[in-house]
Every structure is written in C-alpha cells, then in structure tokens.
C-alpha cells in the first residue's frame, strides 16, 4: 500500500489541524491515498478530549510570557506539549486496510518506535499497560493521541528528539504525575540530526504498517488539499 509523506517543517498547530481535517474528509471519500504529515510545532500545549485544566500547572499569563500557545484538540487524551525538536506525525490512514481496530493501530505506532529505538539507538523501549505511548523506564519518549472518524485516523504521535523538556514542567503530561519524559538529546547528551531521525521514522512506520512511502513536496500536498 502507498503512503504519501509530507514534511512540513515548523507549522502552527491550528494550521496543521485545518490541513488534517481537509485530508481526513478526502480520505473518507477515497479521493486521496493514505498520507502522513511530519512536522514540528512552535511551543504549544494541546488539550485532548479527557482534558483536566488542573494538569496545567502555571497560570495562562505565565504560558504567554514563555511564548507557549494553548489549543483545544479533538484527539484522545489529556494535556500534552509540542515544540521544536519534537517530530510530530499525523497519519491520515483508512483503518479498513489495517484490521479496522483502533487498539491495533495504536499498538503499531508504539511498535514503530520500539523497533526504531532498538535498531537505531540500541535502546530497549516498552509499552505500559496503564498508559499509551513508548517508554524508556519510567520516562516517556513518544506520546500517542489519536482520533478516528469513519475509520480514518487523524492526530498521531510526538517523538522527543531534541525537545526542550523543561516545558513539560508546565503540565502533568497526559495527566500522568508519577512518570517523567525524556528525549534522544537527553539520553545521548547532545542534539541529534533531525533529518536523519525523520528518515528513520518514515522507514519504521512504513515497515510496521506495510506501506510503500512516497515523499511528496509542498506543491503536491497543496494540490491534494485543494481537492474538494
């Protein structure tokens, strides 16, 4: 199966959400192939469908002072952080071709990063029975929060590569108070090559989901999004 992959650089959360919603509709109508957006966001907190405002630990004025935006999202989960140095993936995938199981879909995203971390970085990551995501010990390195509409997915994952982890101190990530967060930069003590990691994400996601990836440029993406 083909998977279009679009790398967008850094993009505001609302702009990415608007693009996802357009692609979701097109995929539901079978007017486009499965597609994954890979990008980074400026410092942003997003609130999922199980949001609890008590998990934001500082006043909104302090968030503004630090240049952190807040958005309400229709993904699953509570509050999470996105920012530069974090690879965010938004797969718009028709689950009719992938077992029509939300649980299996999340499991495969987790498997993507478990394999990537083991084979590329010799890190043994795992799942947690209580929480979604990918963990190294008690620290989360990949957050997962999805939405599914008429069996087409949106939202997705956030992989901490060179993320500013201090911004996670503004929240209880995903409402979790007894665990931490980590990144490749923290583990190895130096920034990682983002382009290299982007390629790894594409490779392992495609392998786990049995996709043939095709990288598309901005022109192609705009042509796709323009289909109404």
UniProtKB/Swiss-Prot annotation:
Domain of life: Bacteria
Signal peptide from the UniProt entry: none
Alphabetically ordered keywords of this record: Acyltransferase, Cytoplasm, Transferase
UniProt-annotated catalytic positions: 174
GO function term, MF aspect, one: lipoyl(octanoyl) transferase activity
Gene Ontology biological process terms in this record: protein modification process
Domain BPL/LPL catalytic: 30-213
Record InterPro entries: aa-tRNA-synth_II/BPL/LPL (IPR045864), BPL_LPL_catalytic (IPR004143), Octanoyltransferase (IPR000544), Octanoyltransferase_CS (IPR020605)
Reactions that this protein is recorded to catalyse: octanoyl-[ACP] + L-lysyl-[protein] = N(6)-octanoyl-L-lysyl-[protein] + holo-[ACP] + H(+)
Sequence positions that bind substrate: 75-82, 143-145, 156-158
EC number: 2.3.1.181
EC class: transferase
Gene Ontology cellular component annotations, sorted alphabetically: cytoplasm
Any Pfam family hit: LplA-B_cat
Gene3D superfamilies: Bira Bifunctional Protein, Domain 2
PANTHER family per record: LIPOYLTRANSFERASE 2, MITOCHONDRIAL-RELATED, OCTANOYLTRANSFERASE
Family: Belongs to the LipB family.
Other observations noted: In the reaction, the free carboxyl group of octanoic acid is attached via an amide linkage to the epsilon-amino group of a specific lysine residue of lipoyl domains of lipoate-dependent enzymes.
HAMAP family listed in its UniProt record: LipB (MF_00013)
Name of the protein described by the UniProt record: Octanoyltransferase
